[in-house]
Amino acid sequence: MPTTTTTAEDGFPATGRLASVDYGTVRIGVAICDPDWILASPLEVHPVSTPEKDAQYFIDLAKSERIAAWVVGLPIHCDGGESDKSKESRKFAAWLKETTGLPTRLFDERFTTVAANAKIRQGKTTRKKTKQRVDAVAAQVLLESFLEACRYRGELAGHCLEDSTSDESLDDA
């Protein structure tokens, strides 16, 4: 693990390599950033398998990529309200934190897939390759948004799992 400085009550580091997750029940997109939180890159798309195999994947990923913390996309409506998918993402984020033992924050993922599709289309890839990469690029867009929000605010963005309830609006996040 890299040396990290903790700044949040949930143990989320102020530096160190982050990984973002675009959670889905079939595929999970993953992106990572450098330890200084400057550049985010799509890493891969993980096909969802059994809970045991998925756990081993994320444990191995955290170790091999020296991940200090996770950012999990939270799908919410344009008005800030949550959906059934939001509950699934919250459950996954709690599972990821428990499984890997790493701090995990939720961050608004509105429009990340739209932005990812636009980004991929600029590269003139085939439809098949677009479908294969869109979740990883959506995770990259999510991580870029998280990093930018942290820089803009001068503090951590998103919500830690403990203070985030499904009744609140995330427009202020």
Curated annotation (Swiss-Prot):
Keywords: Cytoplasm, Hydrolase, Nuclease, Ribosome biogenesis. It is found in: Cytoplasm. CDD domains: YqgF. Its main location: cytoplasm. One of its GO terms (biological process) is rRNA 5'-end processing. GO terms for molecular function: nuclease activity. One of its GO terms (cellular component) is cytoplasm. Its EC number is 3.1.-.-. InterPro entries: RNaseH-like_sf, YqgF, YqgF/RNaseH-like_dom, YqgF/RNaseH-like_dom_sf. Could be a nuclease involved in processing of the 5'-end of pre-16S rRNA. Belongs to the YqgF nuclease family. This is Putative pre-16S rRNA nuclease. It comes from Rhodopirellula baltica (strain DSM 10527 / NCIMB 13988 / SH1). The lineage of its organism: Bacteria, Pseudomonadati, Planctomycetota, Planctomycetia, Pirellulales.
